[in-house]
């Protein structure tokens, strides 16, 4: 078999009381499916997933519903050998929030190469939006890791990207906030860091 079919879903309910507004109930759920190539030896690889995400705030200051149709895709092509490849990843969101509908598109073209003791990724993050201020943003997507010994590595990264501010993300920040509509997404132009990691086992290290 060269293709793997994936399907799944989630359902979540959060009930709590907030003084002056009484009982709140936040309901979230999603249904998703996708296809993925499952032969690493093939030159062309792909991973395509589509999800329908539902969210509702009931008994809140102003009950709201949010529906998102999200499509993620990642296509890669191996170059001269398995150690290097080029690819492009994307996420397209079609958002439906009460009477306001808009779409966002995030593209991530990249080049990746690895050797016995180092890995390199050179890419860019391109963010577009329609019916949402018609925004265009660009940021780097760079990562370099160099293994100096068996249990230590030097790393350098510079990245960025869209910061989503839908109802789901806002609930994670503060479920008690008085939110009447999702905020516009932000965009991180640059987040750069350089450091040194060391540790005896995977998952336990200092940096």
Named regions from a protein language model:
Residues 1-45, 51-68, 97:
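Flexible loop and strand-edge segments within Gram-negative outer membrane beta-barrel domains
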Residues 3-9, 44-50, 69, 83-88, ...:
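Transmembrane beta-strands of outer-membrane beta-barrel proteins
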Residues 100, 114, 119-207:
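Exposed, low-structure sequence patches enriched in small/polar residues
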Residues 1, 31-39, 71-79, 107-113, ...:
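Residues on the lipid-exposed face of transmembrane beta-strands in outer-membrane beta-barrel proteins
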Residues 11-17, 39-41, 52-58, 81, ...:
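Transmembrane beta-strands of outer-membrane beta-barrel pores
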Residues 19-25, 36-38, 57-63, 75, ...:
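Outer-membrane beta-barrel proteins
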Residues 1, 23-31, 63-71, 101-105, ...:
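Residues that define the transmembrane beta-barrel architecture of outer-membrane proteins
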Residues 47, 64-70, 74-114, 119, ...:
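Beta-strand-dominated lipid-handling architectures at cellular/organellar boundaries
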